[in-house]
């Protein structure tokens, strides 16, 4: 038992390189990732896991489309998609570090591109599910998410620190919220509209806060040069 704990702790140290997490579930999530990377067959590469993560996001987008045109029960497919996305997206880079084959810049670029394709697919499903009268909310959601990605990249450029979390909230917490919202929408049809408005407003407020903080960092860096 003690030996297994020491092994898990060592793996945790390896996979935590180059990434500082602040999200609520980080303690349990990192332990789960440390366990899973040891179980991934050698024939599975980090690129394959990235592709699996993308498939998960595409499934979430598809669930909205099927929910809009066939039956809202298809939204439950999005729950499976969230789990698949977490598996691929969380393990791809960490697996590379575990196998001592980190590709920092390649992985960074691939992550950003795949995330953008995935969120666009979800956004398209978002818009179709909400209907034409509320499509501006869907566009707003995509725009706010895109701005969040831009701020993250600029923060990395200015501070040389890359973080995928915004305070206590990270991608995993967002997935959990999406899962909860999908379940509620299946039970109480129409509630998704209110969530969409709320989520877009939260992203707007978060982007304003992070943007102002980013300008402060940029100003401090200019003054230090």
Report each predicted region and the residues it spans.
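Hydrophobic alpha-helical transmembrane segments
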Residues: 1-79, 122-225
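Basic, amphipathic juxtamembrane/active-site segments
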Residues: 82-84, 93-134
